[in-house]
């Protein structure tokens, strides 16, 4: 049975009033598919793994055969009808707590929290829960449901006055005084673990970071001393020496930043992602992305997959101070031998999550050369930055045709049309030009600055902003000017651009113009975001006095 929408309608007569937000306990989407339940193991003979790519920030309630609520313990992979089941890493709230935030984790490849996101939870009157679930960044992820034990079916209503339901060790009594929920031991002093605590069903376990192992007490960690101990923490080969040891990777793989894990090399370009997988890993397998029409191409030694940020099922999301683009490479046995001579297979399935991260905050520079004598003004050529923006100089206020090869000719006080343009037009994102300032040199930290935009507000009355159909593009008009002094013959523009999720009502982009008097109000502050400076020019231009 497909999910259905339960809505409560509110009719008000008389004078107009402000809109009333519906209580999520009475306005939610039911998730009732049997395959969501934690008892449902993935059987690909009955169909491909499932994915919650339709989930997109709405409120949901688990009902029917899906279960009563989300599990609060680690679910093994290949359950809930998918490869990477998603569970709630935290206890359910009480009714008086209102809406709370919890971490949701996806289990895969032996890691109970290989991927995580933040969801919202509310306890409703009647003893059930509703969840505001975010869209997973990659497939195959599914939010799981679970049937919790009933301690005594006859224990209901006033029976609590005469007797008390008791739950098994590792579980606690729920707000309905009847259901036994899993106890999250990790919420109390991290379960006594010195590093990582993983909540399990009716229990928990301690884990250690890469290159470290548990001591005999099962709670504290120690450094790996050599290859004889857990292979040195290396995912593949461990090479010992008199001075210690180091991890090595098979040909075609690269060592990740933790210096212990080997991974497939991924090239994050400004408008595309490229994955090169050694053929030894994929012999006999056919590789494809989330959109199965996007497939790998073999060059004899590697299988190459090239895809853009808005095709092949790529999911682009804003996570903290980064823009994250994700996809999943899946390898399944070929139906017939390939032209490259693959007659055998050594694995039944290959799954490679692919992620590229880009900073949210950018500083983009562009320059021009003003002429005091009202003779032609030459605009410096544009400079590309890293994903996702460039600063373009346009020919008119239609902002459709930027100057490409031929430089424009302008005079002082003529109109200069410039704009922030995304390299790739990705839906679900929006931008805010937080500041734009001019300098007489290409240095961003130049002492002499003239602000056109500051704190998201136009600070020069001569600046005009135009509306754009694209949430990421911003267009402006300003009269051409120069700095005082005969030596100041160049002007450079620098713009700080911030990227946000278009549905995030508390983001810095949603706040817009942010005067200093408003700082400290609720919502996101871009001061804590990691920024990246994109250098541009200058291109030297002959100057005639």
Curated annotation (Swiss-Prot):
Q: Locate the ZP domain: which residues?
A: 261-516
- Which residues are listed as membrane-spanning? none
- Where are the glycosylation sites? 89, 116, 291, 299
Which Pfam families does the protein's record reference? D8C_UMOD (PF23283), FXa_inhibition (PF14670), Zona_pellucida (PF00100)
Q: Write out the ranges of the annotated region (Disordered).
A: 518-545
Q: What span is annotated as the signal peptide, if there is one?
A: 1-22
According to UniProt, the tissues expressing it are described as: Liver-specific. Expressed only in the hepatocytes. Down-regulated in hepatocellular carcinoma (HCC) and HCC cell lines.
Which SUPFAM superfamilies is this protein grouped with? EGF/Laminin
Q: Which CDD domains match?
A: EGF_CA
Detail the disulphide connectivity of this chain as listed in its UniProt entry: 186-197, 193-206, 208-221
Question: What organism does the record attribute this protein to?
Answer: Homo sapiens
Origin organism lineage: Eukaryota, Metazoa, Chordata, Craniata, Vertebrata
Task of the protein: May be involved in hepatocellular function and development.
One GO CC term, this protein: extracellular space
Keywords noted in UniProt: Calcium, Disulfide bond, EGF-like domain, Glycoprotein, Nucleus, Signal
Domain EGF-like positions:
182-222
List the protein's name: Oncoprotein-induced transcript 3 protein
């Amino acid at each position: 049975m497909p999910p259905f929408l339960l809505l409560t309608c509110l009719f008000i007569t008389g004078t107009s009033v402000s809109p009333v937000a519906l209580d999520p306990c009475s306005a939610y989407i039911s998730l009732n598919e049997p395959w969501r339940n934690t008892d449902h193991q993935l059987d690909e003979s009955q169909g491909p793994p499932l994915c919650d790519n339709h989930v997109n920030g709405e409120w949901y309630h688990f009902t029917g055969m899906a279960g009563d609520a989300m599990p609060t313990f680690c679910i093994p992979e290949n359950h809930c009808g998918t490869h990477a089941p998603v569970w709630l890493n935290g206890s359910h709230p009480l009714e008086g707590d209102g809406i709370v935030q919890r971490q949701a984790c996806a289990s895969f490849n032996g890691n109970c929290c290989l991927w995580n996101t933040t969801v919202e939870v509310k306890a409703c009157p009647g003893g059930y829960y509703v969840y505001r679930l975010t869209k997973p960044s990659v497939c195959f992820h599914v939010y799981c449901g679970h049937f919790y034990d009933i301690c005594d079916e006859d224990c209901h209503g006033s029976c609590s006055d005469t007797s008390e339901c008791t739950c098994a060790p590792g579980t606690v009594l729920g707000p309905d005084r009847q259901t036994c929920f899993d106890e999250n031991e990790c919420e109390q002093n991290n379960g006594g673990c010195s590093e990582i605590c993983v909540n399990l069903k009716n229990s928990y376990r301690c884990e250690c970071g890469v290159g470290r192992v548990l001591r005999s007490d099962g709670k504290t960690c120690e450094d790996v001393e050599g290859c004889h101990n857990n292979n040195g923490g290396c995912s593949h080969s461990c090479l010992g020496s008199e001075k210690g040891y180091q991890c090595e990777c098979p040909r075609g793989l690269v060592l990740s930043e933790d210096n212990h894990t080997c991974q497939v090399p991924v090239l994050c370009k400004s408008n595309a992602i490229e994955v090169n997988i050694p053929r030894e890993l994929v012999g006999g397998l056919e590789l494809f992305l989330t959109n199965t029409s996007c497939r790998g191409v073999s060059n004899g030694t590697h299988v190459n997959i090239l895809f853009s940020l808005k095709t092949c099922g790529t999911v682009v999301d804003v996570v903290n101070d980064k823009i994250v683009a994700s996809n999943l490479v899946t390898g399944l046995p070929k139906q017939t031998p390939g032209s490259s001579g693959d007659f055998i297979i050594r694995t039944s399935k290959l799954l490679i999550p692919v992620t590229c991260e880009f900073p949210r905050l950018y500083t983009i520079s562009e320059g021009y050369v003003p002429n005091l004598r009202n003779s032609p003004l030459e605009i410096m050529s544009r400079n590309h930055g890293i994903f996702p923006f460039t600063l373009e100089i346009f020919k008119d206020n239609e902002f459709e045709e930027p100057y490409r090869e031929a430089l424009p000719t302008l005079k002082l006080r003529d109109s200069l049309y410039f704009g922030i343009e995304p390299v790739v037009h990705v839906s679900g994102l929006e931008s805010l030009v937080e500041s734009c300032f001019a300098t007489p040199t290409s240095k961003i930290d130049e002492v002499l600055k003239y602000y056109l935009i500051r704190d998201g507000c136009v600070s020069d009355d001569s600046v005009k902003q135009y509306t754009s159909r694209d949430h990421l593009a911003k267009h402006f008009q300003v009269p051409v000017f120069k700095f005082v002094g005969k030596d100041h013959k160049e002007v450079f523009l620098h713009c700080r651009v911030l990227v946000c999720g278009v549905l995030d009502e508390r983001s810095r982009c949603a706040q817009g113009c942010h005067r200093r008097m408003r700082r400290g109000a609720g919502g996101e502050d871009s001061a804590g975001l990691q920024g990246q400076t994109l250098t541009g020019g200058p291109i030297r231009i002959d100057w005639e006095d």
